[in-house]
């Protein structure tokens, strides 16, 4: 029987990031941010066991610190990213200006763990 290949967490994360870029390039900033959020949440879930839903930014940061991520710079970057996701929720017009930067920062943030 043909085994359906299960994607690794990093493949799933990468898929979301690629999709976010496609949406952004097409001017669909709404969906771009949704995909970026999925990418980040998928990564946090698999890397740090942080639930994908119903978790406030503060809870995410707390959980990161509990899980032994003592790198303040990384924690700070994530905090800024999460704040930006929140900001564009309340100010959707900012998505157009922010998606590219957000995309780059999510990619960079996740990449730092490949080395770690």
Task: Please place each PLM-identified region on the residue numbering.
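Solvent-exposed, low-complexity, intrinsically disordered
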Residues: 1-116
């Amino acid at each position: 029987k043909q085994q359906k290949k299960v994607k690794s967490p990093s493949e799933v994360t990468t898929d979301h990031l690629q999709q976010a870029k496609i949406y952004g390039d097409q001017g669909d900033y709404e969906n771009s941010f949704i995909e970026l959020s999925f990418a980040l949440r998928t990564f946090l879930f698999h890397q740090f066991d942080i639930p994908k839903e119903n978790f406030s930014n503060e809870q995410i940061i707390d959980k990161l610190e509990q899980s032994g991520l003592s790198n303040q710079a990384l924690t700070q970057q994530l905090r800024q990213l999460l704040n930006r996701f929140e900001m564009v929720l309340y100010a959707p017009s900012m998505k157009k200006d922010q998606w590219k930067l957000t995309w780059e920062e999510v990619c960079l943030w996740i990449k730092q763990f490949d080395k770690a």
